[in-house]
């Protein structure tokens, strides 16, 4: 079964994220559990936790259908010790918030070397950051998102994801989220079913589908291999509709949150309905 949704706003209270997901007929959703552009946030109150859990139960969202995202400020591979520790502390807090909310996944961008350390050193720092966070939490899986490779961001190669996983001690609590726009911008073609087959055969060989814990379904304003992260509405960008239809018809993508981060929230309900309709092999438009 496909879980399909979008990254919805939690403005006004975390419980509102579930309500907004229902409003677009989503069977999955993503959210920030705190302001994603601030380092610190007030601790979750018992009321906030209870209201969120009640809303999820009311609208039938289990933790398998929810993919929280951490702060954009966090860099788990930071080359400077003091800044690395700050990021690690913030990541642990994000993981603990998920644990309190009964959520089993936390999606995050792996990190950047900032042109100051080697890729290998940065990837090792990211893996160690995950180990530290897993040691201080229970029941939450760290879900590494592939990147477009802008600037000095790592995670744009499947080999980067595999290297991080290799350095994580608890393999049961680490996974990956594949963003289609990021993959395309990083040089993984998705424009035809044949290219999708090739790209995900590479993914299966290098990383492994057992680690796939979520996806971000985004078309791309950016061009193929450009290393530029620019999302677009489904079918409106340089990837086109075929990739998303292909994903909907492949059962390897069942049972994980498939999340839209496309640029026009006003048509998320339409995009979700279209994705749901593609699950039959007869779907061609």
From Swiss-Prot:
Gene3D superfamilies: Divalent-metal-dependent TIM barrel enzymes. PROSITE patterns: AP_NUCLEASE_F2_1, AP_NUCLEASE_F2_2, AP_NUCLEASE_F2_3, AP_NUCLEASE_F2_4. Binds 3 Zn(2+) ions. One of its GO terms (biological process) is base-excision repair. Zn(2+) 2 binds at residues 145, 179, 216, 261. CDD domains: AP2Ec (cd00019). Its cofactor is Zn(2+). Zn(2+) 3 binds at residues 182, 229, 231. Its EC number is 3.1.21.2. Keywords: DNA damage, DNA repair, Endonuclease, Hydrolase, Metal-binding, Nuclease, Zinc. Zn(2+) 1 binds at residues 69, 109, 145. One of its GO terms (molecular function) is DNA-(apurinic or apyrimidinic site) endonuclease activity. It catalyses: Endonucleolytic cleavage to 5'-phosphooligonucleotide end-products. Disulfide bonds: none annotated. InterPro entries: AP_endonuc_2 (IPR001719), AP_endonuc_F2_Zn_BS (IPR018246), Xyl_isomerase-like_sf (IPR036237), Xyl_isomerase-like_TIM-brl (IPR013022). HAMAP family: Nfo. Belongs to the AP endonuclease 2 family. Endonuclease IV plays a role in DNA repair. It cleaves phosphodiester bonds at apurinic or apyrimidinic (AP) sites, generating a 3'-hydroxyl group and a 5'-terminal sugar phosphate. This is Probable endonuclease 4. It comes from Shigella sonnei (strain Ss046).
